[in-house]
Amino acid sequence: MDPVTFEVLWSRLISIVNEQAAALMHASFTTVVREAGDLSAGVFDAQGNMLAQAVTGTPGHINTMATCVRHFVKKHPLETLEPGDSLLTNDPWLGSGHLHDITVVTPAFKDGKGVGWFANTCHAMDIGGRTLGAGARQVYEEGVNVPIMFLFRKGELNRDLIDILRANVREPDQVVGDLYAQQAGNDVGAAKLIATMEEYDIGDLEGLSTLILDRSEERTRDAIAEIPNGRYDDEVSIDGYDEPLQIKIAVDILDRNLVVDYAGSSPQVNWGINVVYNYTHAYTTYPLKCAISPEIPNNEGSFRPVKVRAPEGCILNAEFPCAVGARHLVGHFLSQAIFGALSKVIPERVLADGSAGLWNTQLEGVGPDGRRFAYIFFSAGGMGASAVADGLSATAFPSGIRGVPAEAIEAVSPVRMVKRALISDSGGAGRFRGGLSQEMVLAVDSDLPAQHSCMYDRTRFAPRGFLGGADGQA
């Protein structure tokens, strides 16, 4: 394939997955997806290798999908499927680490032959069980666990599955509506891909896939080779549930290879903050890419030079059936450990500590109209500063999840945002200051009782400043 054609096709793939994500968001029933962007979308070759991802999305979804799709391919190889088939799962140990994230995978066919896959992951507004949080002791308490199964078969909806979900979730219309939106996104992506293949007379994706993945791998290895060989370590303390936890990390650079080892980190706990390996891998590779190779496409090829190790049974490689609902309260701190280790060798490329763990606010109750409601939205503290710029205020990193506007919250629920304001001087001082945190005051416009669940961290251990900068506020 000549270089010009390759670049055109690569640009087309990026355009296609961005249209896939846009279609999903436009069709979504929930502010979690269409406003906060808690989703991912990507295209995969016939073997399940991730080729390209949409710009909109979160690392905890897109990087776990790179592994998750292979489980679908193993259980349902392309040659066993037909046009109109589509599959899904929310198994935390196959996907993105908790039951609220549902992955929908759809094969793409050209002239009756399977040529690739489109997949997306979205956060469901509800999945049954306990209210989303860290209070469960086992995953069985956290909601409905759907193994890999058909969502559509030859174009026919799996109504038994839909009936089970409707009977178990608090917001059935929103949950089922988003499944249709996810399917719509994949269908748009597949249609655009096939049109492109026909335009350029391409029979399959094998040649293009090999070029994309091999080039990404080589460029990533070249970027790693620019860092001096050695072992760089760090340790991060976080609140935990009832006692603090430690994340210990060693980053080994050896020529064109990189190994991350979390040996010595705290063991898994009896609360829902445990992290499955897929999620650990996702939030390890993302900050590494930010620091080492930000311009290189994020795909299966760029993952090849990086090995991630976490002992079985530790907080970062938790074993079934432990509870995992609030796994992000630990997993989002991996970027701080990565940057802490790399600050010893490439300090100009990393961020200081920030708030890290995404804030989840969920309210459940009965509205003034007598209807039950369950609503969740996300917020964040500040990002750490870099060596060249202030940290962003009220911005989620590393998740990239957007805060939901007060107007959007109030339009679809009886929740009222009484106050939302930045907290002065909450970011650490320095030549470049840390981003500011925020204060929120909420109310429910109903005389009937409501339940509030909030997930957060950074109440015991302040975010660290780097290169002589001051710590931020806990």
What function would you assign to each model-found segment?
Residues M1-P83, L88-K110, G114-A474:
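Glycine/proline-enriched, intrinsically flexible loops and inter-domain linkers
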